């Protein structure tokens, strides 16, 4: 059981560690100390739920549904381009945009909406949690699947809270206007690069 837990933990960690929309948003909220723990919690809960769905039968369904993959992929492309544009505006028009961003992210429900968007409109999340982890965990016996799921979900919890708290710890430096411009420039590049990759994948799916 312990070995299955450890297997789930490290496989999940390998999926989560590469910087993507979820990690970028949690880091950004941590640098501003605005709902950063809530952001980490919701990301971890979402990942845990999707991992469970994949391990207990959802992997085959998503793999076979071309229409669902198309919907998630192009929805993700549109959102990532929009989010990247918002980050670029902070870089180009720092004073005005930072003031607007600071006001908008103080709205709890707006933050919740963005968290769900970077999670549920990100096809990589589905591929990592449901398809990859789900297919591996789904091959285990019924008594070991909960341990694999618990281990994988624990990695998600550990990572998102560590990232959030670390960013909050360095908030005095990261919250400065120059730092925010650098962070947002980095986020813009990440979002648009992922959107470009997803668009290429979407065209392949349509074929």
From Swiss-Prot:
What topology does the record note for this protein and the membrane?
Answer: Multi-pass membrane protein
Q: Where in the cell is it found?
A: Cell inner membrane
Specify the superkingdom.
Bacteria
Answer yes or no on keyword Cell inner membrane: yes
Annotated Gene Ontology cellular components are:
plasma membrane
Q: What Pfam families does this protein map onto? A: LysE (PF01810)
User: What keyword terms does UniProt attach to this protein?
Assistant: Amino-acid transport, Cell inner membrane, Cell membrane, Membrane, Transmembrane, Transmembrane helix, Transport
Query: Reaction catalysed?
Result: L-arginine(in) = L-arginine(out)
Is Cell inner membrane among this UniProt entry's keywords? Answer: yes
Q: What is this protein called?
A: Arginine exporter protein ArgO
| Species, as recorded | Photorhabdus laumondii subsp. laumondii (strain DSM 15139 / CIP 105565 / TT01)
Q: What is the lineage of its organism?
A: Bacteria, Pseudomonadati, Pseudomonadota, Gammaproteobacteria, Enterobacterales
């Amino acid at each position: 059981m312990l070995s299955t837990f450890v297997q789930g933990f490290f496989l999940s960690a390998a999926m989560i560690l590469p910087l993507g929309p979820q990690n970028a948003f949690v880091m950004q909220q941590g640098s501003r100390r605005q709902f950063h723990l809530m952001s980490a919690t919701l990301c971890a809960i979402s990942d845990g739920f999707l991992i469970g769905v994949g391990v207990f039968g959802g992997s085959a369904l998503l793999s076979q549904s071309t229409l669902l993959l198309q919907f998630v992929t192009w929805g993700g492309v549109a959102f990532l381009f929009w989010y990247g544009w918002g980050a670029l505006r902070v870089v180009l028009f720092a004073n005005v945009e930072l003031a607007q961003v600071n006001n908008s992210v103080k709205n709890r429900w707006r933050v919740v909406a963005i968290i769900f968007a970077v999670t549920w409109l990100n096809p990589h999340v589905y591929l990592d949690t449901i398809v990859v982890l789900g297919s591996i965990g789904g091959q285990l016996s019924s008594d070991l699947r909960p341990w694999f799921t618990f281990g994988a979900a624990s990695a998600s919890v550990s990572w998102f809270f560590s990232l959030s708290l670390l960013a909050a710890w360095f908030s005095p430096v990261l919250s400065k206007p120059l730092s925010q411009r650098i962070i947002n420039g980095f986020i813009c590049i990440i979002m648009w690069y992922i959107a470009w990759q997803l668009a290429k994948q979407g065209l392949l799916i349509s074929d």
